[in-house]
Regions:
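Short, flexible segments with low predicted structural confidence
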Residues: 23-24, 78-79, 122
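Extended hydrophobic
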Residues: 38-113
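Cysteine/selenocysteine-centered motifs that mediate thiol-based redox chemistry or coordinate metal-sulfur cofactors
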Residues: 27-35, 108-125
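Short, flexible helix/strand-to-coil boundary loops that buttress conserved ligand/catalytic motifs
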Residues: 20, 99, 118
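Short, solvent-exposed recognition segments
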Residues: 1-64
Length: 125
């Protein structure tokens, strides 16, 4: 609450970047512009964005805020462009890897359902 972050930071940023058609150099440039608490290596960040593109959701394990983990999924329009992001944050260590995967999958399902509902009229025309 009351905190401002770069749009590309954290799980929300990875989720949005994953839905955009960016090459590795563009993702690395975004990475360089973020003020990290614990910066991932640029290649690791690129790999995280690419993994988010496959899974449909992204995670940040305390790299923006120590002790806070976030899972996020982008809500996309009919053209696949990210318009909104659905996210959940928790204290790091609260969930194991399997729990985070389950939360991520649920976030992806919810984001897809919201997108389908929000853009249903666009899809019908």
């Amino acid at each position: 609450v009351g905190q401002r972050q770069p749009a590309a930071a954290g799980a929300t940023g990875r989720a949005v970047l994953a839905r955009r058609a960016l090459d590795d150099a563009a993702i690395a440039a975004v990475h360089a512009g973020i003020r990290w608490k614990s910066a991932p290596d640029p290649q690791e960040f690129i790999a995280q964005v690419r993994a988010a593109a496959v899974k449909g959701w992204a995670i940040d394990n305390g790299q923006i805020n120590h002790g806070i983990s976030t899972v996020a999924a982008a809500i996309v329009d009919t053209g696949g462009a990210p318009r909104f992001v659905l996210s959940a944050s928790m204290f790091s260590g609260r969930e194991n890897a399997e729990g985070m995967d389950a939360i991520g999958a649920a976030m992806r399902q919810a984001a897809d359902a919201i997108a389908q509902s929000a853009y249903a009229m666009e899809m019908a025309t």
